[in-house]
Amino acid sequence: IFITHSHYDHIGALSEVKRVWPKAIVYGSSYAEYTLKRKSTFEGILHMSNVAAQEYTGENLAEPLDMSRIQVEQILQDGACVKFGTDAIYGLETPGHTNCCMSFYLESEKVLILSESTGMVRGPKCTTTCVLKDFAQAKQSVERCRNFLAEYFVFPHYGIIPKRLADSVFETIVQDMEEKETMVTELYQQGVS
């Protein structure tokens, strides 16, 4: 199990997945490991999971989350790989959305599974960014992934896009980042925090 970052909408089901497949190993960044050991992280995951459950079902979670199953069990350093027989998955640290973001490259298929630092696709010609930590890091993460050897890119909350289309998607994501960075800078200079 490879986690891109520690937000509830990406790992909220991890407790149940680990209950069903207890021998599965959870891989993530060292910062994700640190984050998932914090009480405040658990409280946030529980709260947001209940908010989502309320929104979709009108009820809280049927069962409480077992935080002991929501942990990084194996730290994957930047550039490190995990072998699966003759195949390998490589981890790429891609911060910007959070400090713990990672993207993953499945070598045999030439597929790069992106973290939210690299932006999101909402539909045809509609992209957005969700930079919560650092615009410069997010832009570096986009460029790193954009120039990677991948033939296919899996965008978070969307799906797979081939390389021939991904370049224009990345371009609109960078433009969106720059617009948002300008807006945030202007608001900050006006005293808004």
Regions found by a protein language model. Name each.
Residues 74, 133-137, 176:
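Soluble or luminal CAZymes and related metallo-dependent hydrolases
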Residues 88-168:
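Metallo-beta-lactamase
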Residues 163-181:
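Short, electropositive alpha-helical surface patch
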